[in-house]
Amino acid sequence: MERILENAMYASRWLLAPIYFGLSLGLLALALKFFQEVVHVLPNVFALSEADLILVILSLIDMSLVGGLLVMVMISGYENFVSQLDIDESKEKLNWLGKMDSSSLKMKVAASIVAISSIHLLRVFMDAQNISTDYLMWYVIIHMTFVISAFCMGYLDKLTKH
């Protein structure tokens, strides 16, 4: 009975595979939105103010960071929890493939969240004259919560590895 239960639990890891595939569909949707934004801004690039152009570029950077985060979670999560990727040695291989454990993945995710939050905060500050002080204060508090959380996670990770 114990062996059957253990084998069933071990096999259940494959339930994560469609979830990771779903993330790739999310990446496709993000790429479509990215290029929709590019196509939308290009015809109007000369009519945009510098601040508006910077906001669009920050939005594109934000989407690229989220896309990188999706790829990282999708591939390393699959490798850590489902199955090792069998990639031909003759093909191009990401240098972190097979080296990112769940602890380092958490740190990369935390760093990405801080970077994404920073871009959102910069976007908010660029329009600060039209935003209430309370909203700005809460945005900074939330961002600092992300920063402190990432720092604490890194510190705890360092403590547990030594």
From Swiss-Prot:
Its main location: membrane. It comes from Pseudomonas putida (strain GB-1). This is UPF0114 protein PputGB1_0714. Belongs to the UPF0114 family. Keywords: Cell membrane, Membrane, Transmembrane, Transmembrane helix. It comes from the Bacteria. InterPro entries: UPF0114 (IPR005134), UPF0114_bac (IPR020761). The chain crosses the membrane at residues 15-35, 53-73, 109-126, 136-156. It is a multi-pass membrane protein. It is found in: Cell membrane. GO terms for cellular component: plasma membrane.
